[in-house]
Amino acid sequence: MRYCCTVLSVSDINKARSFYEDLFGLEVCQDYGRNVLFSCGLALQQDFDWLIGIPEEQVCKKPHNVEIAFEEPDFDGFLQKLNGNPAIAFLSGVIEHDWGQRVIRFYDLDGHLIEVGEEMKMVIERFISNGMTLEEVSKRMDVSVDDLLKLLKYDV
């Protein structure tokens, strides 16, 4: 067995597809009309009720029990892109987690919660450029020095 994708219910496949392509640069690898699969493993499905065999009114909107998470190396640049998009409904502004990663959460066109955070490598590099040692970064982020070194070598 292998994991193949996560499927999101969408009301308009064309608008949803454009949203994910334009905002995140996702690439479609399969297009079946009412169903689109991106190369990252995210899929969009119009007429979700038909697909899984339930009444349309049982398809939930904004359940707040799952989020689609992305990491962005140019977080500030992405924020500028977001602020220029009138279709974006924000859950909140930018927050900084205890481990130092800045994130923002907002909704897609169908109410799915999305988180975009600074790439962890960038967080570590920001701390180091501000004069922190790896040991201090390790303590601040509650991550071992070995794991920090792995993250610093990680290339997307």
Where are these regions (language model features)?
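Conserved short beta-strand elements that form part of the metal-binding/catalytic scaffold
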Residues: 27-62, 113-118
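Helical anchoring/docking segments at protein termini
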Residues: 2-4, 9, 31, 37, ...
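Short glycine-enriched loop/turn motifs at secondary-structure junctions
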Residues: 1-2, 59-65, 98
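Vicinal oxygen chelate
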Residues: 11-13, 68-113, 129-130, 140-150
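N-terminal beta-strand motif that seeds the catalytic metal site of vicinal oxygen chelate
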Residues: 1-14, 66-68, 119-156
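Short hydrophobic/aromatic beta-strand or adjacent loop that forms the aromatic wall/cage
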Residues: 33-35, 65-67, 101
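Short secondary-structure junctions
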Residues: 25-30, 89-93
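Amphipathic alpha-helical segments
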Residues: 12-26, 84
